[in-house]
Design a protein with these regions (language model features):
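Charge-biased, low-complexity intrinsically disordered regions
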Residues: 2-246
């Protein structure tokens, strides 16, 4: 199990490339590195949380189209900025909101908790197995040659991002394509995950306060998943111009 210093060192190496901030200067990433998690199937608490998220999603949509939710609309604009088609590749928040009407997926209590927090706070949120990382996480615009470990028709395949696509990666390859669309198989959460990385993505109109509130909620809920859970967090944002962001 990593100690708190190792978690801090891991996050200290994380970075967002200047080319990404040039694309969206309003982008912020809040990273949580967590260990001491006790794996387990979904339970009454995680199911109740998902039900609350489903209710919140229906209230947020209020019968209207998902793409009119302000943060979803902002992410659709960001996807178009690097050449993706948001009607074909949806950000993770939009994908969950669209599923909420018929019921959010029940996977395991760790995945269920972070999916519910994503919907409740309307913020894209990814979770990955920290122990399977090779080096620190980096958000970059892809060269197009980086390997991406995924599956097609149930068969493991290696794909590559489009040149200029915004991707999360580590030293071994892409960990998430199109900012927050699809995660790699290599680093995905597993039934035996005890250390995890969570990435919360924000664009305007989401405020820093709202982003931190989502992280606080997630951290509090994760703390219930084991007697020795430890969490370290780091916020990454573009350097504000004088007079901006306080």
């Amino acid at each position: 199990m990593p100690d708190a210093g190792m978690l801090e060192d891991f996050l200290a190496g994380a970075c967002v490339d200047a080319a990404v901030f040039a694309l969206r200067p309003d982008y912020r990433a809040l990273l949580l590195a967590v260990d001491g998690l006790v794996p387990g199937p979904g339970d009454q608490d995680s199911d109740a949380l998902l039900h609350a998220a489903e209710t919140a999603a229906r209230q947020a949509l209020d019968g209207g189209p998902t793409e009119q939710v302000p943060h979803v609309a902002a992410w659709r604009e960001a996807y178009r900025a690097f050449g993706a088609k948001p009607q074909r590749t949806r950000n993770s928040l939009e994908a969950l909101l669209r599923r909420a009407a018929s019921g959010l997926p029940r996977v395991n209590r760790l995945t269920d908790v972070y999916n519910a927090v994503s919907v409740l706070h309307q913020i894209p949120l990814g979770g990955e197995d920290l122990s399977r990382y090779s080096g620190a996480p980096r958000l970059v615009r892809a060269a197009g040659t980086e390997p991406f470990d995924t599956a097609a028709d149930g068969i493991a395949v290696i794909e590559h991002p489009d040149p200029g696509e915004v991707v999360w990666c580590d030293d071994a390859g892409v960990t998430c394509r199109r900012w927050n669309w699809r995660q790699a198989r290599r680093t995905q959460l597993r039934e035996d995950t005890t250390a995890a990385l969570f990435i919360l993505d924000a664009l305007d109109p989401v405020t820093d306060q709202e982003l931190h509130a989502a992280a606080e909620d997630l951290a509090a809920r994760l703390a219930r998943l084991g007697p020795g859970v430890r969490t370290v967090r780091r916020m990454m944002a573009a350097d504000p111009a004088p007079g901006e962001r306080g």
